[in-house]
């Protein structure tokens, strides 16, 4: 597999082909995949890398992927992030002329209470309409999943009492090409303030593919005729993504940018680190000082955390579906 950015600028060209006759067993297949990256500036480059690496790891040797990254113009960017977009991204106006096979649309940091009030809502809704008939399959992640079902079927997300953050065991509910070969529960990171109603999704014709007893529906899908796949979680997150988000939220609390002290991600840190974080929380509540952020302790994750395993399985099946024509 050769993984490319627009303009044939290679990220990596790994030697993944098996030796001997297996290399000639199938003709090479080239797929064009688009990534609409709506993540905030602090996570913009990390998301590029996560998705690129994930596609590289999931694709079989005979599949060559050309990855085009896009950013919605209605999402405000800092000068540094804008420069990154200008240098490495494809103009969103070119989307219609690139013959995209599959699309991945990320979430975004929520600003408005209602999705339809977000500055980028018209652009995101237009992407939903375009993807319905111009892709074979599209992945909608987190906030993008909530936005898509709102636009398609007027299904409103519901605000949670507290942030859903952690790694949760998600079990397969029904057979589907996306969940082929998945028997054991998947460890899936979730990080969200909202949720969609599972019975309402089923009533409107969505297939529930995986769910968690703790946090409800995880992956659901619907044929539009493009096969739309919706992630409420973040299987693409690397091992430290939730830790970075948690450290950011603590820093915001210490700086007075949020009133409540953030809860640590569930089923994520080791028992020793959870004890350290409890002690730090007591200090932070007693002395709310931004300089304390520099004293955040080193942390370790739970030893049985299978970081990235769920994403590799899901994206392997997703790429296989695209490659089958």
From Swiss-Prot:
UniProt-annotated site: Important for substrate specificity, residues: 191
Pfam families: HTS
Residues reported to bind substrate: 163, 191, 248
Keywords: Acyltransferase, Amino-acid biosynthesis, Cytoplasm, Methionine biosynthesis, Transferase
Domain of life: Bacteria
EC class name: transferase
Annotated metabolic or biological route of this protein: Amino-acid biosynthesis; L-methionine biosynthesis via de novo pathway; O-succinyl-L-homoserine from L-homoserine: step 1/1
EC number, as in UniProt: 2.3.1.46
Record-marked site positions (Important for acyl-CoA specificity): 109, 143
Compartment annotation: Cytoplasm
One GO process term, biological-process aspect: methionine biosynthetic process
GO cellular component, one term: cytoplasm
Active site, renumbered: 142, 234, 236
Entry function: Transfers a succinyl group from succinyl-CoA to L-homoserine, forming succinyl-L-homoserine.
PANTHER family: HOMOSERINE O-SUCCINYLTRANSFERASE
UniProt similarity note: Belongs to the MetA family.
Name of protein: Homoserine O-succinyltransferase
Originating species: Bradyrhizobium japonicum
Gene name of the encoded protein: metAS
């Amino acid at each position: 597999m050769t993984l490319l950015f627009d303009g044939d600028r290679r990220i990596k060209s790994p030697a993944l082909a098996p030796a001997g006759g297996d290399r000639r067993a199938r003709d090479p297949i080239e797929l064009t995949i688009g990534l609409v990256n709506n993540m905030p500036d602090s996570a913009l480059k990390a998301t590029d890398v996560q998705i690129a690496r994930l596609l590289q790891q999931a694709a079989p040797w005979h599949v060559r992927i050309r990855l085009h990254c896009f950013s919605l113009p209605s999402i405000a960017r800092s000068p540094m992030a804008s420069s990154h977009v200008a240098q490495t991204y494809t103009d969103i106006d070119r989307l219609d002329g690139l013959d995209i096979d599959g699309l991945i649309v990320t979430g975004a940091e929520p600003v408005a209470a209602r999705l339809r009030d977000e500055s980028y809502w018209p652009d995101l809704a237009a992407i939903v309409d375009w993807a319905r008939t111009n892709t074979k399959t599209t992945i909608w992640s987190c906030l993008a999943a909530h936005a898509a079902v709102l636009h398609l079927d007027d299904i409103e997300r519901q605000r949670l009492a507290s942030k859903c953050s952690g790694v949760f065991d998600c079990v397969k509910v029904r057979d589907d090409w996306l969940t082929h070969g998945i028997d054991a529960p998947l460890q899936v990171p979730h990080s969200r303030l909202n949720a969609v109603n599972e019975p309402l999704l089923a009533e409107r014709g969505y297939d529930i593919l995986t769910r968690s007893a703790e946090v409800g529906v995880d992956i659901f899908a619907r044929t539009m005729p493009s096969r739309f796949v919706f992630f409420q979680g973040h299987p693409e997150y690397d091992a430290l993504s939730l830790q970075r988000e948690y450290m950011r939220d603590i820093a915001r609390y210490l700086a007075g940018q949020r009133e409540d002290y953030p809860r640590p991600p569930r089923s994520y840190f080791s028992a020793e680190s959870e004890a350290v974080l409890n002690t730090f929380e007591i200090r932070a509540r007693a002395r709310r000082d931004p300089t304390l952020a520099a004293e955040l302790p080193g942390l370790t994750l739970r030893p049985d955390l299978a970081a990235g395993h769920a994403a590799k399985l899901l994206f392997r099946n997703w790429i296989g579906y695209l490659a089958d024509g």
